[in-house]
Regions:
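Short alpha-helical donor nucleotide-sugar binding micro-motif in glycosyltransferases
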Residues: 259-260, 267-272
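Nucleotide-activated donor-binding/catalytic signature segment of Leloir-type glycosyltransferases, i.e.
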Residues: 243-260
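A short, well-ordered alpha-helix in the C-terminal region of glycosyltransferases
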Residues: 338-352
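Short hydrophobic beta-strand element within catalytic cores of glycosyltransferases
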Residues: 297-300
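Aromatic "clamp/platform" in nucleotide-sugar-dependent glycosyltransferases that forms part
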Residues: 280
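Conserved donor-binding/catalytic core segment of Leloir-type glycosyltransferases
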Residues: 188-217, 231
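Carbohydrate-associated surface elements
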Residues: 155, 176
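Conserved acidic donor-binding segment of nucleotide-sugar-dependent glycosyltransferases
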Residues: 312-323, 331-336
Length: 375
């Protein structure tokens, strides 16, 4: 089939949706499908106003406009998008959306208006905004008009199911991972030293990086001096706040190396012991899945998407509060044999979210979208 991938953001931006949409495009190409992407993100050299760039073999229509802070918004895009979708002979559209995705929502209005079969994947937790969305009614209307709805995890799908109402199927289309790329094998016997904690995240309030450092400080107090080392990978607007906390509290065992490449990320995970995922509103947690694929036990929050690939007490810990996370960290710092057991379990059982499977699930969503339009 010929697929139009529609997303506010795309490479060269490097957020979760951007990278997942790019990787999905690659997987669809490998399956023999034809793929083009449409985005409100400028190209690497500033391309916009509909210019087409090619990223790893995929034509990317840059329907970006000049906006403050290069926001991925273009109120003038729908007319041109409609023309390109009609002339392009697409079989199905796949919209990638978050809590606020004005370009993606404009795209959905266009595809629904054209009668183009449309799949829509939600990469966010809707619980907090579901009442407002319910009043606005647009999500329910799209579902009623045949948009095949999905979310990236069961916890993300549940509020969406309540929003669209009984009788409407909401699927789960998880984020995908290249297991072979992330698996590093058995690291061998661990060298003595502090429990090496790692996280990779955007340093923004929603991801709670400052709260993470504070709870790890509490864990260190429980486990004893020299028991922990924390590396926080990533950049974002809260970096200054986190740096001040580290400096003011004398936490010389907390490191903030910034953003790193995928290759360096994999190497850093392999050299660590435990991955931490403190966000409450994590709809999936692709970085945590990558770390789990390397072998790391993951400590995450109940009610987040981490529960899709972490079972409490089996290959990681799933906790209900920051205090409980601090206790779990301290417990593992005192019990290296338990860390090794969880790591061995992760290495022996690769995650189910392998890209080859996820790509087939995406194609199944496209087939469902076609069936809903023909119904």
């Amino acid at each position: 089939v010929k697929v139009a991938l529609l997303s506010d953001c795309y490479l060269p931006r490097l957020g979760g949706i951007e990278v997942q949409t790019h990787d999905l495009a690659q997987q669809l190409l490998a399956l023999g499908h034809e793929v083009e992407a449409f985005t409100a993100t400028r190209g690497a050299e500033g391309q916009m106003h509909g210019e087409v760039t090619v990223v790893d073999g995929v034509p990317v229509h840059r329907l970006a406009a000049r906006m403050p802070w290069e926001l991925p918004v273009n109120p003038w895009a729908p007319k041109e998008l409609r023309r390109r979708l009609v002339e392009g002979g697409f079989d199905v559209a796949h919209v990638q959306t978050g809590v606020v995705s004005p370009f993606a929502w404009d795209c959905t209005r266009v595809t629904v208006g054209l009668g183009l079969p449309t799949a829509m994947t939600w990469h966010c937790m809707l619980a907090g905004v579901a009442p407002a969305f319910g009043v606005a009614g647009f999500v329910r209307r799209w579902a009623a008009r045949g948009v095949a709805m999905s979310a990236v995890s069961e916890v993300a799908a549940e509020p969406l199911r309540r929003l669209v109402g009984d009788g409407v199927h909401v699927g789960v289309l998880p984020n995908g991972i290249d297991v072979a790329r992330w698996a590093v094998g058995d690291p061998g016997e661990r060298a003595p030293g502090p429990l090496r904690l790692v996280t990779a995240t955007r340093l923004a309030a929603r991801k709670r990086p400052a709260a993470l450092v504070a709870l790890v400080e509490r864990a260190a107090a429980l486990a004893g001096p020299g028991s922990l080392e924390l590396t926080v990978l990533g950049e974002g607007p809260d970096r200054g706040r986190v740096e001040r906390y580290v400096r003011d509290h004398g936490l010389d065992w907390v490191h903030l190396p910034g953003r790193v490449t995928r290759e360096e990320l994999r190497a850093r995970y392999a050299a660590s012991d435990v991955y931490l995922s403190p966000a409450r509103l994590e709809s999936f947690g692709i970085a945590a899945l990558e770390a789990r694929t390397v072998g790391l036990p993951v400590i995450g929050r109940q009610g987040s998407g981490v529960g899709e690939f972490v079972t409490d007490g089996v290959n990681g810990r799933v906790v209900d509060s920051d205090d409980a996370m601090a206790v779990a960290i301290a417990d593992l710092a005192r019990d290296p044999a338990e860390v090794a057991r969880m790591r061995a379990r992760n290495l022996a059982e690769p995650p189910a979210q392998e890209w080859s499977r996820v790509a087939r699930l995406a194609v199944a969503e496209y087939e469902r979208a076609v069936g809903l339009v023909r119904r």
